[in-house]
């Protein structure tokens, strides 16, 4: 059975990217209870075998989504004929240097689409899976979670290096890639092209509205109850939503709150969710680079944080949503257009993990820096912080 409404992708979780709303209100009861999922209670410790399988799923599993990317969007044809490595790197695709033969980059033509086909054949393009026949034609092309939620360390050259799973690919221009499809109408292509690098709208193919989100990190999730900006469900809920409705995977997903009920036989998604979650839970938030934080200033900032921010950014997870709290957009001072499209109609306080790494901030990327975030909440929450206190608070946030 095919999914007729899927036209895009993204990945998993959609967790947050910065300081989220501070306030004390909760949404009505009917919007606070996440839909039940197949997700079992989290284990205290996942086995090495399960985490290893989860890594495989995260990096290489398409869930059968070739039915979208190949059969419907025909992007296999576009990549084979028109996408050379230089173009691929410009739209944010990454290359895993660990699978490249020594010296290969010095020997190949980075302006030839045939080189892209060769890289796909070596399984070197992060987040893409391709079947290449004996005549070097791409017969099947699909995407994986890693497309949006992995990057590389640029150790070979920009866009080519060692994998960094869980790091959001803020260079990836998802919309521009989708817009390469020869089957899309011009007005649809214009919407996709408007999103820009590092953003994606995981509901556009459901409601026809466009309010793209910043691609979130997939690390630091182990103590976080709900993984989306609007807290509609736990990690396996969102993984299933994206795998089925966005990536085009052949699996089951149902949420009556959103009017979605998709089933496939066989279901290629549900059985893989526990291992995928185990791998995501194993990915720690990256510490700030050595020497990048002034410890004395950060300690002053911690005192300010404890006084002004910790009522919402509570505990090790940094979110009061673990206790069920959501915040109406009016309390946050951020745009409510995206929340209005969701089941909860509200925003979750975002966990503060690895903030130094993933600017811009807020769900829509409207704050370019942590200083902008602090200034925003100083104004909205009337905190009365001096410029020096704001700088101290920023330094503390960089340390998380």
PLM segments and residue spans:
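Bacterial N-terminal signal peptides that target proteins for export
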Residues: 1-10
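N-terminal acidic, proline/glycine-rich, low-complexity intrinsically disordered segments
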Residues: 2-3, 24-26
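Hydrophobic helical h-region of N-terminal Sec-dependent signal peptides
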Residues: 9-17
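C-terminal motif of bacterial Sec signal peptides marking the signal peptidase cleavage site
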Residues: 19-21
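Electron-transfer interface patches adjacent to heme c in soluble/periplasmic c-type cytochromes
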Residues: 25-27, 34-55, 60-277, 281-298, ...
